[in-house]
């Protein structure tokens, strides 16, 4: 009888759950014990092969028949014996074996349970098991493979398999197996010869079995990696050879192993569930934190918005308070104006203005009589002579300066002036002429008048009456703009104080309650100026003039006949500083000598732009005499009466006050010129100049502009040149000079004590250049001058000196 060694005839595989009990082994024992009696039925029965779930070869059938023949005498004793001599294997029991095996009656409950278990496995249903091991079964655990062997061999080989493959040390089982081995040794020689074939077969099967174990372990490890797929497939292969007496022990051991594996599986599932739960909790915590953060951010944004609203409301309230104060001040000014109109006697005052014109013989000072049909002006000769010989009555002095003087600026600018009417000492009584409506002297109250003055380049001149009595003194400036080009588009407001000066005042014989102010208008400007009230009317007079270096409009009362208004050719900006100046005019190229009266407050919103091109004229308005004359466009009104007056002196004339002015009238607001100390002489050029220096000329004369920096309490000096000369050598440095004129010394006339001092040198950069000076003494006047030094050591001419005040608006209002 030959056996195919490469094949596995003795290996029977069936599907079973992982928690299968020892009842299956009992079934297998019953099957092996009944093989001798039911050999024919088993060999011819077709359901036998499907029940074992294996492939039965002819060798296997022959081996089963041989086993049945060999073990036939001992069948009855084996059924009752506690330790059968057949190997124990797991296999589902067929239904017909339950009726043929007497030993199955003892294990009916277990057999029934296992039948249910097998039925549920085949139908892929997970019905609960009645056995204790079935209760521990995990529903997720799938069915595995269980390999069983039924070969008939010696107990020694079975012990080796049991110890090597299963690695379970069972002492009691080993003793029983030894007893069975002794019984096997007493068998017939045929049995020994027949057993030789299964022994050789078993060796081959054990080698194959070891390989299968490795494959199953690797496959089981691979299956366990599918934890995330919610599918677990357990494979358990057992090969147990023992007698029937060790069934309980083996059952307990297998159950223990299965429970351990199941516990590991449950712990794995529990760990996975716990990890998922932790992840969910973390996500929930993160979402909660984000919501809290968003809520906190929203709260902060709401607080910020509320604070912004509060700040906005506070700013609005402060602005409203300022507007209210301004309105109250305007109302008080209007009331004071009404009171002054009620108490002022009716008279007509003519204002005399002097214009600095060029040396052209066809243009001179002129008297303009308003051609309006109202009795605003009195052309009577006695009144004119009286006004000409007495002290000045009305003075208008500008406080706001701009950067764009002379005829090169735009003509559409205007300023708003405020006139403060203030009475002064009047030692004489007006008795030289009868007044129709009452000639008694009445004290004049203070009066604030907003008066828009259209000046060239935003620069207001000085209107001074030669007939004494009332003077306009600057009080404050509501807007002071940049010293270069910002004045072209802004309308600063100037405040004047109308103050009555001491001196003999003659009353007018006219009954018209008006003061006629002859207004100086630049060429091409507007011809009408709104009058502040019924008591003061402003008319304009124009004559064709030439661009002259007129720094201010001042009094010129050389003869009694020089009365009446004159038109200024172009009022010049005064020094670029925010000082209120009544400036006297000088020659075309000489430096103007402004004498400041007060300093207005510079607004915070003013902008200083030091990037103006060279086409801007210097601040003082001094230009070359070669400028072509500019003709004036006549206004639509009737032409004024012009009476020419001869100019005394040569082409250079400084405006002087009238000879009848009292000494008390010489105040800082007057237009008397202030003599400046001579500028330092330029040092001699180097004795030896390089050859290339002979082809170049000394540096050009710079043009200086001044501006105030209110926030830093400083003065900005900026300079440039009118037109760049290519023949001049490169400039190395600029030298800055200044001298400090005290206010009291200017009043006392101690100008000889003023000396120029060098305040520093600035490395030359591309023009225009600027620098800022700080740390000044309040209440003083400063004059500045700049000259250039080229790379060969030669000095150029000084610029026209510029002046500025360092004085507070309060002090100017008190002067």
Swiss-Prot record:
The modification Phosphoserine is found at residues 125, 127, 628. Residues 698-811 form the Fibronectin type-III domain. Residues 208-219 have a biased composition (Acidic residues). Keywords: Activator, Coiled coil, Nucleus, Phosphoprotein, Repressor, Transcription, Transcription regulation. It comes from the Eukaryota. The keyword Transcription regulation applies. It is found in: Nucleus. GO terms for cellular component: nucleus; transcription regulator complex. Pfam families: ATF7IP_BD (PF16788), fn3_4 (PF16794). GO terms for biological process: DNA methylation-dependent constitutive heterochromatin formation; regulation of DNA-templated transcription. Residues 677-689 have a biased composition (Pro residues). GO terms for molecular function: transcription coregulator activity. The modification Phosphothreonine is found at residue 344. Residues 1-228, 315-385, 400-438, 579-704 are annotated as: Disordered. PROSITE patterns: FN3. Belongs to the MCAF family. Recruiter that couples transcriptional factors to general transcription apparatus and thereby modulates transcription regulation and chromatin formation. Can both act as an activator or a repressor depending on the context. Mediates MBD1-dependent transcriptional repression, probably by recruiting complexes containing histone methyltransferase activity. May belong to a complex that represses transcription and couples DNA methylation and histone H3 'Lys-9' trimethylation (H3K9me3). This is Activating transcription factor 7-interacting protein 1. It comes from Danio rerio (Zebrafish). The gene is atf7ip.
